[in-house]
Amino acid sequence: WIMGHMVNAIEQVGEFLNLGADAIEFDFDFDKDGIAQVTHHGIPCDCGRKCTKKAIFTEYLDNIRQVTTPDDPKFREQLVLLALDLKLQRISSAKAYRAGEDVAKKLLDHYWQRGNSRARAYILLNIPLVEDYEFIRAFKDTLKNEGYESYNDKVGINFSGNEDLDKIRDVLEILGIHKQVWQADGITSCFARGTERLKEALEKRDTPGYNYINKVYAWTLVRKSIMRRSLRLGVDGVMSNNPDRVIKALKEKEFADKFRLATYNDNPWEKFRG
């Protein structure tokens, strides 16, 4: 999976898909009451990127629904995964539950259209910190209470704040989540990062019987040397400002027989058995 990073304006969706991404990540801000308002990262952000691009959250969802709906004029077959970067660290943890309710209802109304939409993308909820785990509980409670619990099959969880992996496992245990879990590791493209935690995540992913990491991705990679390093370690995904560079790396002799771009037929919640 090649995740286009910080795709927060509607016009950027096509731009990143044209560069080769099969997944996009977008940020969204909440108001003080935990209501999702806009797709927006803000300052600071990655080097060389404009930090202030934005869209109204519901309008963004309406557009991305069309882009991921077969037979729609806007349909792009390659887009199979949406990573929602939840800026929960900007609001009180006490509002995390309310935020989870709101996001679930907005997805029901604007993406899934309560069963009337054929939009097919998988959705990855990126939670910045484990202290905001009530967002996940609220999200799942809302799907159940609204009568659409089946959509849980399309939704995965990722804690993206580089926290202790055992601490993350403990929170997933509290929530009763033992599947559909990604683990991110990374840092803004402005800085270098070692591989110790990334290797630990990959080791846990590959441990038989360990159910708290199904996939691992590295972010935000812009240098080909770092992309190659991550591929050699065996990541499932790469988040990048430059998807075209990842595409070129995948075509190199070292990787061409080991990796390919994920499609809709690849389940993002299953561990890869090579």
From Swiss-Prot:
Primary enzyme class: lyase
InterPro entries named in the record: PLC-like_Pdiesterase_TIM-brl
Cofactor(s) needed: Mg(2+)
Active site: 5, 41 (nucleophile)
Cofactor: how bound: Binds 1 Mg(2+) ion per subunit.
Catalytic activity: an N-(acyl)-sphingosylphosphocholine = an N-(acyl)-sphingosyl-1,3-cyclic phosphate + choline; an N-(acyl)-sphingosylphosphoethanolamine = an N-(acyl)-sphingosyl-1,3-cyclic phosphate + ethanolamine; a 1-acyl-sn-glycero-3-phosphocholine = a 1-acyl-sn-glycero-2,3-cyclic phosphate + choline; a 1-acyl-sn-glycero-3-phosphoethanolamine = a 1-acyl-sn-glycero-2,3-cyclic phosphate + ethanolamine
Subcellular location: Secreted
Tissues in which the protein is found: Expressed by the venom gland.
Recorded superkingdom: Eukaryota
Amino-acid positions noted as binding Mg(2+) in the UniProt annotation, renumbered to this chain: 25, 27, 85
SS bond list: 45-51, 47-190
Gene Ontology terms: biological process: killing of cells of another organism; lipid catabolic process
Entry's Gene Ontology molecular function annotations: lyase activity; metal ion binding; phosphoric diester hydrolase activity; toxin activity
GO CC terms, sorted: extracellular region
Keyword Magnesium: yes
Family to which the UniProt record says this protein belongs: Belongs to the arthropod phospholipase D family. Class II subfamily.
Function: Dermonecrotic toxins cleave the phosphodiester linkage between the phosphate and headgroup of certain phospholipids (sphingolipid and lysolipid substrates), forming an alcohol (often choline) and a cyclic phosphate. This toxin acts on sphingomyelin (SM). It may also act on ceramide phosphoethanolamine (CPE), lysophosphatidylcholine (LPC) and lysophosphatidylethanolamine (LPE), but not on lysophosphatidylserine (LPS), and lysophosphatidylglycerol (LPG). It acts by transphosphatidylation, releasing exclusively cyclic phosphate products as second products.
Name by which UniProt lists this protein: Dermonecrotic toxin SdSicTox-betaIIB1bv
Species name: Sicarius cf. damarensis (strain GJB-2008) (Six-eyed sand spider)
